[in-house]
């Protein structure tokens, strides 16, 4: 039997539940990272469906069948992901048939769809449990009906394991799962205090509000801005507002941080808003953006790259460049390019920050080794289309006082235009910009380093050394350095 997504009525009860079964040896063996669970849970939650259980099972018919049978009796909906395809280890259809005591039979519509798609060797996909239903949703990318349907058996929906396909199918068939009786409300709070220190307050809050809301506490050891994320979750708005007031009155004063988790995604909006604010920092931002916009007018994106070594200055520059490109080209066709000159013995934390930054900003890394002159030569040889490099240089940096915003390389050097948007910025400007916009930066700066090089020539800045409440020596974060002239005291 076939149906359109709209033909099945959405959930109408207050409680609609779901269980998710992820199928695949590759997940259990660590060969493939599971991203489907996150997407399924988040989407179902937005549809008013409470996900109660997630199970990961191997490509074994009996194991899958047992889990499907159990889940189907316990939850309103069961969604499986994976194990659908033409090969020997694609056994989900067979397992679901076994779970309900049915036979596998060829389905005429699936046979026709496979023939239309020209799927040679995919005949196995037409063999489904005898009571299978077919659901033809609308592809959110094209607006056209899917050419191959989603198969369901009773309350079990069999999704493909390929993340891109799974997302498109669920987006196109949301109506199958929509629970109009419930809308979950969520609020995230960010606390700059240790989880242990606020645990009694959180316990009191949960006891006070009881079943009216759920209060989750999640420590984060890598954030530059908070130590704990709190998630308030309820079917009603009122308990969230009441709990927010309750926590605000009891948490340590100033510990709630107005953190913006989507600082990179919304960089264009936030950076330009700051530039137009008229503040002292805003004027510096406006000047830097003007330099970057001039560069974007003179060069194609493929001719530009950002010099990036993970330091605070180039992190600020990258965020500015990303914001300007985001504003000028809302749909950038390819990743932004960065030049990374690998040092002989980099900090592991710096290497990790580089990898995180590549993902956050969707970057293409042009890697080189040696000193700056050697690196530029290697860059020119490997990427002859490049003509200009944006640098995070400030006038207070060594040998930089005579530079201009657009400075060609010196005679005898590989020919590039050096673009210096931050030339007139100060150490304080850099930190005000990063911290005000919640831009992620290397965690070493929170441990007392103020200028980063390699492990051989970089130490914590003695100007930031102090004693903890327990009398142990610790280092304050780099943004608290009072005398900017002591910035490079980290370097040996």
UniProtKB/Swiss-Prot annotation:
Q: Which CDD domains match?
A: cinA, FAD_synthase
So what does this thing catalyse? FMN + ATP + H(+) = FAD + diphosphate
Tell me where in this chain the PTM Phosphoserine is found. Answer: 468
Pathway-wise, it operates in: Cofactor biosynthesis; FAD biosynthesis; FAD from FMN: step 1/1
Report if keyword Acetylation is assigned: yes
Any idea of its EC number? 2.7.7.2
Stretches for region FAD synthase:
303-460
Q: Could you say which cofactors this protein requires?
A: Mg(2+)
Summary of the function given for this chain in its UniProt record: Catalyzes the adenylation of flavin mononucleotide (FMN) to form flavin adenine dinucleotide (FAD) coenzyme.
Query: What name appears for this protein in its UniProt entry?
Result: FAD synthase
- The gene it comes from is Flad1
């Amino acid at each position: 039997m076939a149906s359109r997504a709209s033909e099945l009525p959405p959930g109408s009860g207050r409680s609609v539940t779901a269980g998710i079964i992820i199928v695949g040896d590759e997940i259990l063996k660590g060969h493939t990272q599971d991203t489907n669970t996150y997407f399924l849970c988040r989407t179902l939650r937005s549809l008013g469906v409470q996900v109660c259980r997630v199970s990961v099972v191997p490509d074994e018919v009996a194991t899958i069948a047992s889990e499907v049978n159990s889940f189907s009796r316990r939850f309103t909906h069961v969604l499986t992901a994976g194990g659908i395809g033409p090969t020997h280890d694609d056994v989900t259809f067979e397992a679901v048939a076994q779970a309900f005591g049915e036979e596998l039979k060829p389905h005429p519509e699936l046979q026709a769809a496979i023939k239309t798609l020209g799927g040679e060797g995919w005949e196995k996909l037409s063999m489904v449990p005898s009571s299978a239903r077919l659901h033809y949703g609308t592809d959110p990318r094209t607006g056209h009906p899917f050419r191959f349907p989603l198969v369901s058996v009773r309350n079990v929906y069999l999704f493909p394991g390929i993340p891109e396909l799974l997302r498109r199918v669920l987006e196109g068939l949301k109506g199958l799962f929509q629970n109009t009786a419930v809308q979950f409300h969520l609020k995230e709070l960010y606390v700059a205090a240790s989880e242990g220190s606020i645990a009694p307050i959180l316990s009191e809050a949960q006891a006070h509000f009881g079943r009216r809301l759920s209060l989750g506490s999640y420590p984060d050891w890598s954030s530059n801005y908070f130590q704990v994320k709190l998630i308030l979750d309820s079917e009603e708005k009122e308990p969230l507002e009441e709990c927010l007031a309750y926590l605000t009155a009891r948490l340590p004063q100033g510990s709630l941080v107005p953190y913006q988790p989507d600082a990179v995604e919304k960089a264009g909006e936030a950076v330009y808003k700051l530039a137009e604010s008229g503040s002292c920092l805003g004027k510096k931002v406006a000047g830097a953006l003007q330099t970057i916009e001039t560069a974007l007018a003179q060069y194609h994106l493929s001719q530009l790259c950002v010099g990036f070594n993970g330091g605070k200055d180039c992190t600020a520059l990258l965020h500015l460049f990303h914001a300007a490109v985001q504003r000028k080209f809302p749909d950038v066709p390819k990743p932004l390019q960065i030049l990374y000159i690998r040092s002989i013995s980099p900090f592991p934390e710096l290497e990790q920050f580089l990898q995180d930054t590549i993902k956050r900003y969707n970057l293409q890394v042009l890697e080189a080794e040696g000193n700056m002159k050697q690196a530029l030569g290697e860059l020119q040889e490997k990427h002859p289309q490049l003509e200009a490099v944006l640098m995070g240089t400030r006038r207070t940096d060594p040998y930089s006082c005579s530079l201009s915003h657009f400075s060609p390389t010196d005679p005898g050097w590989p020919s590039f235009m050096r673009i210096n948007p931050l030339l007139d910025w100060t150490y304080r400007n850099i930190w005000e910009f990063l911290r005000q916009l919640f831009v992620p930066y290397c965690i070493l700066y929170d441990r007392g380093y103020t200028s980063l090089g390699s492990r051989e020539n970089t130490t914590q800045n003695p100007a930031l050394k102090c004693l903890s409440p327990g009398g142990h020596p610790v280092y304050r974060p780099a943004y608290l350095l009072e005398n900017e002239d002591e910035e490079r005291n980290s370097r040996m």
